[in-house]
Amino acid sequence: LLLIPFLLSLSGSAQIINFGQDRAALRWKQIKTDQFQIIYPDFFEKNAQRMANIYQQLYTHSHTSGIHPRKIAMVVHADGGVSNGNVALVPRKSELYVLPPQNPTDTWLEHLCTHEFRHVMQLDKVNQGTTKGLSYIFGELFPIAVVGLYIPMWFMEGDAVAYETSVGRIGRGRSPEFLNEMKAQILEKGIYNYSKAVL
């Protein structure tokens, strides 16, 4: 009887929703290839097929840069309130939050997939040679420590933006809206030095 208030208080805190939670009622499907697995809600079927085509092209293109990404699971959260993504090494997956932006174009999904795939390529590139050897000693998350210590996040994101711009007809490097803030700052205040620019 004394445990009931305690148990009720725990159930209340379990109702907090974060990016990674989806409604329990969702039905999930998957597309599997030799290179990737896309896990998605059943109502997202048409776009999941589109994503599979995008990823197949990206995998083929990645070999031209000498990077051969290992198989990865792409988990699609199509029922949330954000458009974003992330890549994790443990467990190896990419999570895509695919709410279209307010001014969606027909390329918004291609843009998101391309950007996050570049992060997959980056982490696979870091996880080779000495880093890979040391990850057997220090664990699977060791490459993330290497990134955190030696590669600034602005470089990781800038590289992903440059990649999304270079591989197709999309990318923020082609978007006046994305470049306007930097152009205005340069015209009004000049080019900031490195220390000020990275703040």
Show where each model-derived region lies:
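Bacterial N-terminal signal peptides
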Residues: 1-9
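Catalytic Zn2+-binding segment of zinc metalloproteases
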Residues: 117-133, 159-176
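An active-site-proximal "capping" alpha-helix that borders the catalytic cofactor pocket
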Residues: 55-63, 155-168
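Juxtacatalytic substrate-recognition/specificity segment
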Residues: 14-146, 152, 188, 195-196
